[in-house]
Amino acid sequence: MHTRTAGRQAPSRGFTLIEVMITVAIVALLASIALPSYRDYVTRGNVPQATARLSTLSVQMEQYFQDNRSYVGAPGCTADTTTSKHFDFSCTVQTAQAFTLSAVGKGSMAGFSYAITQSNVRSTGAVPTGWALPDPNTCWVTKKGGVC
């Protein structure tokens, strides 16, 4: 024979639907705030691939010039310079005394363009939407707002 205890229910376990929905809403709100910040952080982390490589190539060009009194034929311009995952590099020798090295973003870094000349003049040719160019444009933009 089964007997029941009058008026006593077993305590319920688990979550109600409304509790789960509130938790999902909070997680979605936090993700909507965190993901754009994370993307900006990753983008800022990829910019040094361009600036460091341009600086290295510029030093190689100057070393070549010291030995040969000309930039024509410098290894910084003749070697394969497309070695970065996020940037394509190129070199233009205008005269024996002048060159321009440039880096153009690709993939997730599309929209970025940096350059440096034999006079060590650095410039940012382009930035993606949401970023700004500095005024005057004599540096490499590394953060949103035209910050160099």
Regions found by a protein language model. Give the residues of each.
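N-terminal secretory signal peptides that target proteins for export/translocation
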Residues: M1-A10
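Membrane-proximal N-terminal amphipathic helix
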Residues: V42-S70
